[in-house]
From Swiss-Prot:
Record keywords: Chemotaxis, Phosphoprotein
Modification 4-aspartylphosphate, positions: D235
Protein name as it appears in the record: Chemotaxis protein CheV
PTM entry text: Phosphorylated by CheA.
Response regulatory domain location: 176-302
Outcome reported for the amino acid change (mutating D235A): Is severely impaired in adaptation to the addition of asparagine. Shows near normal counterclockwise bias in the absence of attractant. Is not phosphorylated in the presence of CheA-P
SMART domains reported in the protein's UniProt record: CheW, REC
Domain of life: Bacteria
Transmembrane segments: none
Gene that encodes it: cheV
GO biological process: chemotaxis; phosphorelay signal transduction system
Chain segments annotated as coiled-coil in the UniProt record: none
UniProt note: domains: Consists of two domains: an N-terminal CheW-like coupling domain and a C-terminal two-component receiver domain.
Residue ranges of every copy of the CheW-like domain listed in the record: 16-154
Length: 303
């Protein structure tokens, strides 16, 4: 099943997404269609000495060597050994990774507004979830795939996010930034790196809806928000309101249209960049390049 030719009919800024639903044990999970390159039958895996316990090994696919991560192992579930098991070939954070899952069933279209933030769940699963979708009698978990990769690589001594601060610059200290990011891990990394570089005046929000309401409150007493906000940095995938919808609303409003908006997301690829352009994003940078983000922010606010 190839999703490279699958036509994503959603327009940018509609605050909707399409997810591929799959099973791991008794639970149903989902992944954004935009992250999925194709879904294949499991193939022979070459084990790698001293690899992480959740990494099954490597496979060769169309001339590329790709790592295989078992979501059975990651979520503490025994593999089913079923002929229905699948490999989901994904692309995000400028890399390709294969996830070993159970059966893959169908694609669902849902609104980000309907996706709830995870609360405390059994076995601490909420640490690796970005949201929960309730569909009639079914609950679908949305894993935080970036955090899964980060945790595995951190255990192996790998610096996923290439943390190399550009150094402190006094000119950055009076600039007001807004960060919109639902991942606590990414929010912390972004804040730490930006503050170390001199960007101390930061307002942060975990979804686009909260950020938009905050910005519109500022707009009540201001005709040009660019005097109060120097730049907005937003993720795309977030419950309640995604980054594309947030960007579209801000650019359509005369009071906020001049505020630079940078999309910082694992979904920034050559194939998907146009979706940010359509809604008016001033800049788009792919995770995990935080150092590149700081350089680009500088070009908008201090240079």
């Amino acid at each position: 099943m190839s999703l490279q030719q699958y036509e994503i009919l959603l327009d940018s800024g509609t605050n909707e997404l399409e997810i591929v639903k799959f099973g791991v044990g008794e639970n149903a999970f989902g992944i954004n269609v935009m992250k999925v390159r194709e879904i294949i039958q499991p193939v022979e895996v070459t084990s790698v000495p001293h690899s992480h316990q959740h990494v099954e090994g490597m496979i060769k696919l169309r001339g590329e060597i790709l790592p295989v991560i078992s979501l059975f192992s990651f979520f503490g579930v025994e593999p089913e050994g079923s002929k229905d098991e699948k490999y989901i070939v994904t692309e995000f954070n400028k890399r390709k990774i294969v996830f070993h899952v159970g059966s893959v069933s169908q694609i669902h279209r849902v609104s980000w507004e309907a996706i709830e933030k995870p609360t405390s769940l059994n076995q601490g699963m909420e640490r690796h979830l970005t949201g929960i979708i309730k569909l009639e009698d079914l609950m679908i978990f949305l894993p935080d795939y970036e955090k899964i990769i980060y945790d595995i690589e951190s255990d192996s001594g790998v610096d996923t996010y290439n943390m190399h601060t550009e150094g402190f610059d006094e000119r950055r200290t009076d600039k007001k930034l807004i960060i919109v990011e639902d991942s606590p891990l990414l929010m912390r990394l972004l804040q730490d790196e930006l503050k170390e570089a001199g960007y101390n005046n930061i307002a942060s929000f975990e979804n686009g809806k909260e950020a938009y309401e905050y910005i519109m409150n500022l707009a009540e007493n201001e005709t040009d928000l660019s005097k109060q906000i120097d730049m907005i940095i937003t993720d795309i995938e977030m419950p309640k309101m995604d980054g594309h919808r947030l960007t579209k609303l801000l650019k359509e409003n005369p009071k906020s249209s001049d505020v630079p908006v940078m999309i910082f997301s694992s979904l920034i690829t050559d194939d998907l960049r146009h979706r940010g352009e359509v809604v008016g994003a001033d800049e788009q940078i792919s995770k995990p390049e935080i150092s590149d983000l700081i350089k680009k922010v500088d070009t908008y606010v201090i240079e």
